[in-house]
Amino acid sequence: MNHLVLGYVGLVIGVIVTKKSMVWRVGQVGSVLLMLPATVLVNMNMTISNVSYMMTSDFVSLGLTVLSIWLLPLMLLASQQHMVSESLIYQRVFVGCQVFLTGALVLAFMASDLLLFYIAFESTLLPTLMLITRWGAQKERYQAGTYFMFFTLVGSLPLLICLIGQYQMVGSLALDLSYEGVFQLSYLVNFWWVGCILAFLVKLPLYGVHLWLPKAHVEAPIAGSMVLAGVLLKLGGYGMMRVSLMWGATAMLSSEVFLALALWGIVVMGGICLRQTDLKSLIAYSSVGHMALVVGGVLTGVAWGYNGAMVLMIAHGLVSSCLFCLANLWYERSSTRNLSGSRGLIMIFPLISSGWFLMSLMNMALPPAINLFGELVAMVALYNWSPYSIVYMSLGAVLTAAYSLYLFGMSQWGNTMKNYKNLYTITSREYLLTTLHLVPAIYLIFYLGLMF
């Protein structure tokens, strides 16, 4: 596992020093080669106790690690078309940012020490900020970058203070130890727990601290949107799972407020999605609603909640990343993301419309999509916590189905505008990109045991 992280360091160096014509090829081939160790990890029954010092892998981290590694070559594949006009130095920086970001994510998911996890967690800020502010499409990208940086830093500071306090009290930040009873169920545990998970709630994000996400998604280039929706949001869910597993029931005493916000966020985000006219904005707000269910599953503190959140995070990473790719595919040809101006795509690109159809169905958790299994298991855990939660979850499910059908219907059906009838055809690169999102999403339906 140490070699896997070092591989990304070597790939960053390779992208910097290679000749001009080989920058993208080195990045793509290197990222594909680094996928090979990930396939080996999937077939190994690894526990937290049989991995090397400072690095770990278990059922919590393995799926997200493989997801991060899988998405890197797809991000490079999606970005190559609109980056060819950039100067060589900017192309090197762009590819280097994506590789470095993936390496930091892999390190965060494999860290066995909370301090190492925090360093990797914060290391994702700078490359993501560069992707948004340098390669965003509109002038509003600077405001989006400011929101992203402000929310991330403000949320992360209490986490650092809590980690320092934990080391002072316990003398250890290891993830494989249990720290129940340190506070002796005093009122301090409530402050500690809120301080610890605030950074993760902002990263997910939870309804109420989600303002940075739609702005970042809308203004980011396609690679930024893919990594944000695919992996970065899951970093928050992973951190919550790790901290709650370490502290057990002691840390769950003050979770009711966040659970209530999560349930309310599912409903509110569904309503907001139905009012959107921008493709990327709708997909971004839908991510907040799905991650609210992840928050609910984790904060219940039971195995069903953890498993449901885990499956839902991986499923959402593939589905939302593909939806952003499909939205970008249309934006590159029409220079618009407006739903009212995107009608009739099924008449222009019929094969790609099948990708839209499948991903919309998966986004609404239609059987037998993998999203359905994650949502059902998380809902069972939430119902066990409070039977009244079924009201919010049922309403959220109806709204999710409504905005998924709204997204597909508004973009695919209707009469095509005359000025969009002579667009250049879909390339093999874009077909491959869509297929590489669909294949694992369908494969996991038959092999759910890989994530449990």
UniProtKB/Swiss-Prot annotation:
Keywords from the UniProt entry: Electron transport, Membrane, Mitochondrion, NAD, Respiratory chain, Translocase, Transmembrane, Transmembrane helix, Transport, Ubiquinone
Positions of transmembrane segments: 4-24, 29-49, 59-79, 88-110, 114-136, 144-164, 182-202, 221-241, 252-272, 282-304, 309-331, 345-365, 390-410, 432-452
One protein family per Pfam: Proton_antipo_M
Enzyme category, top tier: translocase
GO cellular component, one term: mitochondrial membrane
Membrane topology: Multi-pass membrane protein
GO BP of this protein: aerobic respiration; ATP synthesis coupled electron transport; electron transport coupled proton transport
Superkingdom field: Eukaryota
UniProt KW Transport keyword: yes
EC assignment: 7.1.1.2
GO MF, one annotated term: ubiquinone binding
Catalytic activity as recorded in UniProt: a ubiquinone + NADH + 5 H(+)(in) = a ubiquinol + NAD(+) + 4 H(+)(out)
Subcellular location: Mitochondrion membrane
Family listed: Belongs to the complex I subunit 4 family.
Function: Core subunit of the mitochondrial membrane respiratory chain NADH dehydrogenase (Complex I) that is believed to belong to the minimal assembly required for catalysis. Complex I functions in the transfer of electrons from NADH to the respiratory chain. The immediate electron acceptor for the enzyme is believed to be ubiquinone.
NCBIfam families: NDH_I_M
This protein's name: NADH-ubiquinone oxidoreductase chain 4
Source organism of the structure: Branchiostoma floridae
